[in-house]
Amino acid sequence: MAEDRYKLIVAKDYTEQYFRDMWNAAYCKQEIYTFDGIRVFFYDDNFDHAFYESTDRRQGIHKSKKKDVLSMRRLSRFYWIKDVLRDPDAELYVGYESKSKSYTRSKRVAVVKNNYVVVIQIYADKKAKFITAYVADNSIDKIKEGPKWVDTKKNAD
């Protein structure tokens, strides 16, 4: 049901360990598919990337890669990751590879309301790995300037 999607939770009411356990139960141990049939795999080590953020970035230092603070904002959207992946109305974009400074179809970025973003890495036919999820306050314009995702297999028919 659409009304059951995109509900916020009060993250401060739970411990980090609770969320880590829930991550394992709700994501790592489940078979999760995108709306278009891609199986997305989740791993324990994805938790930190998805739910920690950098204090340097909060202070406007955008070069920092360290993630040193658990984000209540990200945790409040804990279940949104599944919602985004399953949402056929999400805006889809080709992902950006910072190392090569180019767009790559091995990454897919899904954007939904309030600029919430989920990134997956496609590594085989109908298989992907979860990369991260966040509210794209500072990067949403850059994401939306990139190429739209087009399902090349669907268009090849």
Tell what function each PLM region has:
Residues 1-157:
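Ribonuclease/tRNase effector modules and their secretory precursors
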